[in-house]
Each structure stands twice: as structure tokens, then as C-alpha cells.
Amino acid sequence: MKKLVNLVSGGADSATVLAIAQKMGYEIYAMSFNYGQRNNAELRKVRELVKEYNVKQHKIVNIDLRAFSGSALTDNNISVPHYHDVNELPDDVPVTYVPARNTIFLSYALGFAEVIGAKDIFIGVHTSDSANYPDCRPEYIKSFEEMANLATNMGVQGKKITIHTPLIDMTKEQIIRTGLELGVDYKNTISCYEPTEDDLSCGTCLACMIRLDAFKKNDIQDPIKYV
């Protein structure tokens, strides 16, 4: 059975990617990060989420991206923006962008992949995020894959490493629809940037607004609880 490293955050996108990877028949090695994020709820959710899939091993890596701050997700001095309507959402890079986060996460995944002999890495970046987050763009993923094959022993031996982005051409609406078709139970996910201590989602941050809109367009109620 082919092995893969699957980056898993505990959000709806991650759950969908896990379901896709399982359907494709991979032996899944999941990797998550405790990086000093404001949303600790995602780590609690991800532990439950991976139990629903045939995950061979789940690693939670501790790193502290608060060391250089620069994001509302890692710096409590920067407020998370809240909105009243999905049409208010920004078109540019928001303060919730964590500098170089996907590069850091993919680098860890790459190292893990080499150790276990996996030539495939899955990450849940997609079209809906590409305008707001530069490290979610297809050209970024392509460049990282090229670097991965130049910078690793596997790559120079001709064992090509592939960064898979199964959601890349999907909107959030399509991602939720795909997950529902694959039987994903989204109640064990959380997308909120600023949930309460008892894991209630705020419903008004960028991530919540996009998620709620996607469920609405699929004519189904989001199963998680909101404030």
C-alpha cells in the first residue's frame, strides 16, 4: 500500500482531503501542528477527526510561530476581523495570514515523508483561499514540489515526490459537497479563527463566513455549534 503524509488542521478542508486520501487507498500518516495558534480547538477536533479514518500514525508537531508574530492567529495584540456579510470579506491578504506557514508545514511533512518512504504529500489548499493567502496558489505548490525533489535524498535518487492538492480547483461550496458525498461528518471539524473556550465558533470571522456560506449553498445546516 502506498504511503502518504497528509497535513491535517482539524478544519473542513482537512476532513475532505482525508476522505479523498482514504478513498484512493493510501496508507495515511497524518501531521498536525501546535504552532501557538489562537484556535487551540482545532487540535482537540483533529484528534477526534483522525479516528474516523484509517490513519496509520498521527503526529502533532510543536513549533512556536509566535516567535515572529505578524498574524492575528498567533498574536493576541492583533484583532481577528469580524464581518456581517460574506460580501464584506477582503480581496487582499488579511491579518489572519500567518507568514510562511504552509512553507513551514510542508517542510516538516517533507522530512516526515523521507523518513517513512512516502512519495506523496496531501494538503488542502484551494481556489477560495488563493486570493487571500499567497501560499495557497497552484504556482506556489508547483515551486515547492520542484524544490522538494532537488533538496531531498529521495528526489535526487529519482523517487519523485508529489505534492497533491485535490481541492485546488474547488470552491468552498464544492469542497463541502464533495465531502458530503464521501460521507464526511463535519461535526468533528472547526474552521473558526476565534472560537470560545468551549469550542463554539464565532460565526463572523472570515473562515466562519466562508464555511457558513458553503453549507448554505449546499442546502444543509452546518453541524457544528456557533455562538
Swiss-Prot record:
For whether the record's keyword set contains Ribosomal protein, the answer is no
Pfam families for the chain: QueC
Question: An example of a Gene Ontology BP annotation on this entry?
Answer: queuosine biosynthetic process
Q: Pathway of this protein?
A: Purine metabolism; 7-cyano-7-deazaguanine biosynthesis
Per UniProt, where does ATP bind? 8-18
What this protein needs as a cofactor is: Zn(2+)
**Main EC class of this protein?**
ligase
Q: Which domain of life is it from?
A: Bacteria
What is the free-text note on the cofactor?
Answer: Binds 1 zinc ion per subunit.
Report the function annotation for this chain. Catalyzes the ATP-dependent conversion of 7-carboxy-7-deazaguanine (CDG) to 7-cyano-7-deazaguanine (preQ(0)).
Family membership noted in the UniProt record? Belongs to the QueC family.
Q: What is this protein called?
A: 7-cyano-7-deazaguanine synthase
Q: Which gene encodes it?
A: queC
